[in-house]
């Protein structure tokens, strides 16, 4: 049987918890990351207790000095949890009491419960963590923009269903991976509006009767406001689920980018060469250069999706207010952040180090009769109904297939036999350069439009980075 040492409860219990219960309840192996935030919140709580007349000036100063000492020891690693500490809160209270004594140290817990305490600390930690994740995502965007700017006119095969479809600019394709990541970061910016609400002062569920000021401590801790409902504040974790969704979405977006790198670096595609520093070899096949970063990023996305699904499953069907199930809310989110902090810099480095074989991409761009749509649209511009234009373009593809030639290799007579409207002027669009240049509407793959996209994406990334408090 365990003792109650290291617990914040026990007066009505004759015996300590069973060893099995103590082992199950223990959370210091993952919630210790909240320790710096716990101490910051305890400093603010000390000041609020003093303002409420629950501490003398001497007691306030003694607690603050003890908390400062504890913070230094936590930071340098000289104070860590003991095996008997149930959680981060119990460990830090023990550390504070060691420094200021049980009478003074025992006063800090007045007016707060672990329920409102951990809900607040989780929000504090997560508001910082999402900024780190966002910065990493913007670094990947920066790498994509740099590659796009370095290849402003390179043309490649655009694909749908993984089949050659229409020529597009490489820069256009790269920016198509940047835009989803920008939306992910924008979600993080928006997320903070809901995360910046402080549960502190809600107590276990009903609020405090000690005259504390939730708004004051919210402001002290950098929150925009205090919670309007103490039950909701202590029991809700939708903020964590929202963050977990964004993390999973980033993982999915990275996975799609990773899949392109994996395909493009294969012998069959041959679009890119991997840098030695950002690839691995084989233990048995000397010739191999493997896209492990991309494959690991693709694999991590499943883990991030699993973290989201697990968290949502934990939250469902819990009655109000707080339930101990919520001990399980942090590990999925902590893990998601840890995985992204590994994957994002690796993906930024991988993308930035890619060497593109622009000649091969250009040579493959017209393969598979990707200029057929250009024929149809050229005919429409000549006044031919699209249904007829589509039929004529399809007939041109069939004729080229029968001769095993490209569309541009059909003779003027062959084109005229397909449709009298197919005059020699159609050859203006039977080049990949003419094809991409013709797609000049907003969002299109024409060089002028893609150049605008590069500037827009770079400016958006800089604006988001500034809003998140980082360097542009």
Curated annotation (Swiss-Prot):
Predominant localisation class: cytoplasm
Matches recorded under Gene3D superfamilies: Fumarase/aspartase (C-terminal domain), Fumarase/aspartase (Central domain), Fumarase/aspartase (N-terminal domain)
Keyword Cytoplasm: yes
One Pfam family in the UniProt entry: Lyase_1
UniProt entry tagged with the keyword Lyase: yes
Enzyme Commission (EC) number: 4.3.2.1
Molecular function in Gene Ontology: argininosuccinate lyase activity
Entry-linked SUPFAM superfamilies: L-aspartase-like
Major enzyme class: lyase
Entry's Gene Ontology BP terms: arginine biosynthetic process via ornithine; L-arginine biosynthetic process
InterPro entries xrefs: Arg_succ_lyase_C, Argininosuccinate_lyase, Fumarase/histidase_N, Fumarate_lyase_CS, Fumarate_lyase_fam, Fumarate_lyase_N, L-Aspartase-like
Family the entry assigns: Belongs to the lyase 1 family. Argininosuccinate lyase subfamily.
Keywords from the UniProt entry: Amino-acid biosynthesis, Arginine biosynthesis, Cytoplasm, Lyase
Protein's cellular compartments: Cytoplasm
Catalytic reactions on record: 2-(N(omega)-L-arginino)succinate = fumarate + L-arginine
Protein name: Argininosuccinate lyase
Signal peptide: none
Organism of this sequence: Mycolicibacterium paratuberculosis (strain ATCC BAA-968 / K-10) (Mycobacterium paratuberculosis)
GO cellular component, one term: cytosol
Functional pathway: Amino-acid biosynthesis; L-arginine biosynthesis; L-arginine from L-ornithine and carbamoyl phosphate: step 3/3
